[in-house]
Regions:
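N-terminal [4Fe-4S]-dependent radical SAM core
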Residues: 1-64, 70-85
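Structural recognition of alpha->loop->beta junctions
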Residues: 45, 107-113, 202-206
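Core AdoMet radical
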Residues: 51-71, 75-98, 113-126, 142-170
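Generic structural signal for well-ordered alpha-helices
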Residues: 65-72, 101-106, 130-134, 171-174, ...
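Acidic (Asp/Glu)-rich catalytic clusters
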Residues: 75-79, 105-111, 131-143, 175-179
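Short, surface-exposed connector motifs at secondary-structure boundaries
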Residues: 110-116, 183-186
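Catalytic cores of alpha/beta
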Residues: 133, 193-206
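Conserved strand-turn element in the central/C-terminal portion of the radical SAM core barrel
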Residues: 149, 155, 180-198
């Protein structure tokens, strides 16, 4: 972070970690979310589209290898990147059979991939998935990171946006993940209509 910036940019953090520009490659998997199938709710979060949250997202009709190759080619050429993070982004990526989870991760092992990021919900963090990630990290030498959707610490706002969990589940998930040493990225939506400035500050504190 330079003296003129008020926060540490994610892109700067990646440059410091890997020594050069790094871009995320989204991987679209045929999965779903417990907030859609009735396990903890229906309809999903109010901000989530039919494909789950996503950017540069290709159809999951493509194989994982084809999604990876196409986006590495496109993003690498457009932004001059040579290193990439394979990003399991849409829906809840620890809400699938464990063997499928392991296989999908193996399919993104690629010479240009330096990290695998798993996006999920705080209430879907289970030991067997964390153990599988640790085993694969040790086996492949690739970094594994986990991205948790919190969105806000305000319980009433969480209810309004139909998240289906509260702050307690998030804190429990962080403690579980920390035992394995994985880096955690927290997703927040600032200035939701039901939040105020105090909520935004409390988000940052948490």
């Amino acid at each position: 972070m330079n003296s003129e910036e008020l926060y540490n940019k994610y892109s700067t953090n990646l440059k410091q970690k890997y020594g050069e520009k790094v871009y995320k490659i989204p991987i679209n998997l045929p999965t779903t979310c417990p907030n859609r199938d009735g396990t903890c709710g229906v309809g999903g979060c109010i901000f989530c589209g039919t494909e789950g949250a996503g950017f540069e997202l290709l159809s999951n009709k493509y194989s994982i290898k084809k999604q990876l190759d196409k986006n590495i080619g496109y993003i690498g050429k457009r932004y001059g990147a040579k290193k990439f993070i394979a990003y399991f982004q849409n829906f809840t990526n620890t809400y699938m059979p464990i063997e499928d989870f392991k296989q999908y991760i193996r399919e993104v092992i690629h010479p240009s991939v330096v990290e695998i990021a798993i996006s999920t919900r705080p209430d879907c963090i289970h030991e067997e998935y964390l153990e599988a990630l640790q085993d694969l990290e040790n086996e492949t030498g690739l970094r594994m990171s986990i991205e948790l959707g919190l969105q806000t610490i305000n319980y009433h706002t969480l209810s309004k946006i139909n998240r289906g969990h509260g702050l307690a589940e998030f804190l429990d998930a962080v403690l579980r993940i920390k035992k394995y040493g994985f880096e955690i990225c927290t997703h927040l939506i600032l200035n939701l209509p039901w939040d105020n400035q105090r909520d935004v500050i409390e988000n940052a504190k948490v």
